[in-house]
Amino acid sequence: MDYIVFDLEWNQCPQGKAKENPRLPFEIIEIGAIKLNENREETGRFHEVIRPLVYRRLHFRTKEVIPMSQEELMGARTFSPVVRDFLHWCGEDCKFVTWGSLDLNELQRNMDYYRINNPLPYPLFFYDLQKMFSLLYDDGKSRWSLEDAVKYLGIPQSLPFHRAMDDTFYTAAVMQKMDLPAVCGYESIDYHRLPQTKQEEIFRDFNTYTKYVSRPFASKEEAMSDKTVLSLRCCCSLPVLKRIRWFSAGTGTYLALIQCPRHGYI
């Protein structure tokens, strides 16, 4: 198996959110990737700038963050042939590695927009290295910037940040420095493609917590009448002593409280 460490840069509507295409709020303009083998040794690179077809001018925020000229964009290939080459380069036996949880979702959203068949496995598990870094070096909840993580690990900063290939280089360097076996069980789940049936629903045990990804429901009432959604249990599977059933906390969030004989209140 190979690791595909990758980073994307994207543009948004230069005329503001009111005029954006709701099917494509962010249009990918650059892909950078490094392939690592099982020993985390580099075996290949992929990099290409992409000519945008929806938002042809760079948003002012994009210009501020990404050192890229309009001329560089206009001389590039478009998304469809680039992403097909990228996926072919990745190969079939690979695990994606990103800094943060957004890149895979945006990659697939762009593929959907251009009607490109999605060959990625389902469910799609990947390494969110930003989360795993926090689990190793912080509280597991904070999210460090890539630049701060590079500084913390003492990695030489020979390249600027905020270009896809450069950020990929640093992400791979962080991965090579980390104690990956200590956190490799904490995979992330891609939510771009949700379960469509009860049989496809995802259950994952991470030892200290569990994750359940349900199929979409037509309404809140339908979701809150489903027995699996309503079930309350600790990840250790011991019978709970007390429970306060699900209640609304506002803004679409629901909370519940249980008392586990081993772990206390959850």
Tell me the role of every PLM-derived stretch.
Residues P119-F133:
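Conserved beta-strand -> loop -> alpha-helix junction used to position metal-binding or nucleic-acid-contacting
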Residues K177-I266:
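Acidic two-metal-ion nuclease catalytic site recognized across multiple nuclease folds
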Residues K95-S101, E106-M111, S145-N207:
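Acidic, Mg2+-coordinating catalytic module of metal-dependent nucleases/exonucleases
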Residues D2-Q108, Y265:
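Conserved non-catalytic scaffold segment of RNase H-like nuclease domains
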Residues F6, Y127, D166:
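Active-site flanking residues adjacent to catalytic metal/cofactor-binding acidic residues
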Residues R57, R61-K63, Q70-L73, Q130-T168:
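Active-site-proximal helix-loop-helix substrate-binding element of RNase H-like nuclease domains
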